[in-house]
UniProtKB/Swiss-Prot annotation:
Belongs to the eIF-2B alpha/beta/delta subunits family. MtnA subfamily. It catalyses: 5-(methylsulfanyl)-alpha-D-ribose 1-phosphate = 5-(methylsulfanyl)-D-ribulose 1-phosphate. This is Methylthioribose-1-phosphate isomerase. Pfam families: IF-2B (PF01008). Pathway: Amino-acid biosynthesis; L-methionine biosynthesis via salvage pathway; L-methionine from S-methyl-5-thio-alpha-D-ribose 1-phosphate: step 1/6. The keyword Isomerase applies. Catalyzes the interconversion of methylthioribose-1-phosphate (MTR-1-P) into methylthioribulose-1-phosphate (MTRu-1-P). It comes from Pseudomonas putida (strain GB-1). The gene is mtnA.
Amino acid sequence: MRERLLAAEKVTAIRWQGGALHLLDQRLLPSQERWLACDNVAQVAAAIRDMVVRGASAIGIAAAYGLVLALEERLAQGGDWEMDLEEDFLTLAEARPTAANLFWALNRMRERLLRLRADEDVLAALEAEAVAIHESDREANLTMSQQGIELIRRHQGNAQALLTYGNAGALASGGFGTALGVIRAGYLEGMVERVYAGETRPWLQGSRLTAWELANEGIPVTLCADSALAHLMKTKGITWVVVGADCIAANGDVASKIGTYQLAVSAMHHGVRFMVVAPSTSIDLNLATGEDIPLEERDADEWLDFGGAPAVPDVEVFNPVFDVTPADLIDVIVTERGIVERPDTAKLAQLICRKRLH
């Protein structure tokens, strides 16, 4: 399966080339495929904040490379680069507050700086760490893809119809994606007959990004309005909802794209299994429950313009980017470290704290 997934890889959103970070501008997809080159930390932070790059894993990877660019600039300026670099850590951390992987990646880069030997080239060491973060996410995607599809096979052996929401694919990660990685593996194994993708308002990640990714690989995909998803579960024989996550609290509550919570409620009502696929770096044991996860809200302007036509003037707008799905609505969380069915605090702590023999 690993070799087949590698051979099928067609989409990537992050490239580190020639000492610059190149990002596929996801705001323009699917009508344009334009790459944006970032050669300083301010550009990387802006790209994260403005959703040129999005998805928790991809944001973390971009931030790691952003620190490499920041260090290069600080070293060229002279002075106390270590103190100055703290400003760059803060700039990147504030770009998107909900993505757990962002803070994990920044902490890992900080820890690498603390482990520097006197004879090491600091810039080369930090660049190597960023590349390692990128590669480890790709490997995690491969592992999760295989684990997720084996779980689906275990519950029902024939080809199935799956529903996904948001975009948890190659565009949102350093590899094949989390939720879409499982779907890709399922299609290659003959386990997925059709994928239904919710449009995912207001940024339309489902219709612009997920449908584009799947169509690029020839995977049968049907796009649906968000308001049709409960009806879809009732009438189209959906067996699994498969989504990604931006942050997972210690008790298994999951912060994901706004609308995921109501999707989980509908899935529970219709007897459809609900799978969350995310790397273990999305789990933050310092957050006891979903109530502790900071949930980003974006500007009202995103809802006040409809194809160039303004909405009702002076109307108030509530524009949360994420919601929290309680753990008791989730059948399984799939990570590269293992699978957690019916997640709770004890199970997630065991997963994260488990000692590795290799």
